[in-house]
């Protein structure tokens, strides 16, 4: 049988994913990825957009599924591409990631979905989590967007 992961590799076009920088006071919500790509690494909560779902609805659903944290009115921060090639230089994964910023309506974490772990991390401690450089950029941008939004 074809696994879900197999269905996301070597596709003819990118997949759309969403992510959120969720703030609670001076902390951001990070999740430890439970699935490939990059299982075990820390990232923003998020995931795949479903057919018929708006990106804003998708990001609210994904944050809730993975962390139990409710958000509303997410604001667009940026769109970035995550492209991973194999040893033969073939594109194995290509995700177009649409990142939002939001404030937590409830800070209590209830782990679920694809996340292996989730926690509130002080913005001063974020760099200790070996995040993808684009994730660090999006977190930095999110503060500006939130303060001007």
What are the functions of these language-model segments?
Residues 22-23, 30, 102-104, 120:
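Conserved hydrophobic "DFG−1" position in protein kinase catalytic cores
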Residues 20, 76, 100-102:
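A structural signal for short, well-ordered beta-strand segments
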Residues 10-14, 41, 89-96, 115:
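A generic structural micro-feature
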Residues 1-21, 90:
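Acidic, metal-coordinating catalytic segment for phosphate/diphosphate chemistry
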Residues 99, 110-142:
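NUDIX/MutT-family hydrolases
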Residues 70-79:
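A short coil-to-beta-strand element that immediately follows conserved catalytic motifs
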Residues 80-108:
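Active-site-adjacent beta-strand/loop module that shapes the phosphate/pyrophosphate-binding cleft
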Residues 24-65:
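Conserved Nudix-box catalytic region and its N-terminal flanking loop in Nudix hydrolases
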């Amino acid at each position: 049988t074809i696994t879900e992961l197999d269905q996301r590799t070597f596709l003819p076009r990118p997949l759309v994913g969403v992510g959120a920088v969720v703030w609670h006071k001076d902390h951001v919500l990070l999740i430890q990825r439970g699935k490939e790509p990059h299982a075990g690494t820390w990232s923003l909560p998020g995931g795949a957009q479903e057919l018929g779902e708006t990106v804003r609805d998708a990001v609210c659903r994904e944050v809730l599924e993975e962390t139990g944290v409710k958000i509303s009115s997410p604001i667009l921060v940026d769109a970035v591409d995550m492209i991973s090639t194999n040893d033969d230089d073939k594109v194995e994964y290509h995700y177009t990631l649409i990142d939002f910023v939001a404030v937590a309506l409830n800070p209590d974490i209830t782990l679920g979905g694809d996340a292996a772990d989730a926690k509130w991390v002080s913005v001063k401690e974020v760099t200790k989590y070996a995040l993808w450089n684009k994730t660090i950029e999006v977190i930095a941008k999110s503060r500006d967007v939130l303060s001007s939004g």
